[in-house]
Structures are given as C-alpha cells and as structure tokens.
C-alpha cells in the first residue's frame, strides 16, 4: 500500500460509505450512532470538517472528523472519530486524514483541538495530556484525553463540554 495518500473533504456521496467504514473499523454500531448524532447536531457539526483519505478509486478508506466543543465558554475543536478500513489500518491513511484535519483547523485559526484516544498514537501529531493545558473533563481526566495548541493563541483552561454526548448501554 502507498504511504502517500490523497485527502479531501467529504462529499455527499461519501456519507453512507463513511458509515460503513466506521462500522467496519470499530466492529460495532456505537461509533456509527455517535457519528450520526454529530451530523444531526448543528452545535457540533461543522460543514467541511470531515477529512477523508482516499484509495486509487477516490473512495474513502479512512477519515478524521472535527466537531465543535467548548472549554468553559471558549469554542475549540474535538478530533474524532478517526477511523480506517481494516485493510488500510497501520498504513498511514488515518494519519493522513488527521494531518489534513489539523491543517484545516490551523487555517480556521482555532485555538486548540482535543482528542479522546490512544495516548501512544496522537502524541505524534503534537497532542499532550489535556490536563497540562488546564483542560478537564467532568468524567475523565486520564492520559487518553489530550489537547493540541494551534498557533499562538492561548489554549483556554477549564471544563471541557461537548454538545453531543452518547453513552454506551
């Protein structure tokens, strides 16, 4: 597989493909429901914020999603889900989508991005534990909650809130 991926913003015809990709990548429905809930919530969903890495046929094989969240009253971005089809995992497709998403976040002049994810994966993109920035989540302040400062703006400190919250049953 290639180490050089084409990336782009999702297009309307990608939506069902990305739902299927999510189910295949995570092996369950919860993350698909999470994705659908974000699409349905205008306080979370940012048009043009789903970045895909594509295969040779321009079909998405991985993606990274940016949505709106807040630290206190300050809007920042949340990264996730990030997913790749099993056949494309560990081949750089997901990382390419993450890099495209973070580049777009910098262009938007956002102050920061948070992610709840693998603490051995996201530091390669510059993420550090969110508590180092004074960002706290009411239910979780562990090593998997990370933040990335974008640009020169101060990273807001305070309580992290999301407009969409789903709990696993």
Language-model region placement:
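Short hydrophobic/aromatic beta-strand or adjacent loop that forms the aromatic wall/cage
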Residues: 48, 141-145
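Short amphipathic alpha-helix that is part of the acyltransferase structural core
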Residues: 1-37, 44-61, 152-169
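Conserved beta-strand in the GNAT
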Residues: 50-52, 59-69, 75-83
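Conserved active-site alpha-helix within GNAT-family acetyltransferase domains
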Residues: 107-111, 116-141
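Conserved acetyl-CoA pyrophosphate-binding loop and the N-cap/start of the following alpha-helix
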Residues: 88, 92-100, 110
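Short alpha-helical functional segments enriched in proximate histidine and acidic residues
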Residues: 104
């Amino acid at each position: 597989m290639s180490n050089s991926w084409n990336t782009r913003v999702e297009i309307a015809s990608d939506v069902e493909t990305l739902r299927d990709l999510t189910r295949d990548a995570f092996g369950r429905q919860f993350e698909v429901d999470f994705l659908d809930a974000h699409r349905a919530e205008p306080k979370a969903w940012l048009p043009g914020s789903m970045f895909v890495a594509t295969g040779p046929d321009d079909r998405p094989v991985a993606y990274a999603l940016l949505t709106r969240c807040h630290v206190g009253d300050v809007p920042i971005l949340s990264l996730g889900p990030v997913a790749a089809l099993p056949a494309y995992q560990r081949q750089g497709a997901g990382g390419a989508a993450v890099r495209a998403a973070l580049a777009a976040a910098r262009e938007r002049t956002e102050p920061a991005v948070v992610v709840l994810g693998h603490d051995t994966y996201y530091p390669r993109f510059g993420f550090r534990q969110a508590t180092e920035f004074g960002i706290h989540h009411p239910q979780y302040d562990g090593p998997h909650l990370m933040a990335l400062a974008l640009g020169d703006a101060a990273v807001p400190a305070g309580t992290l809130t999301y407009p969409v919250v789903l709990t696993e049953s």
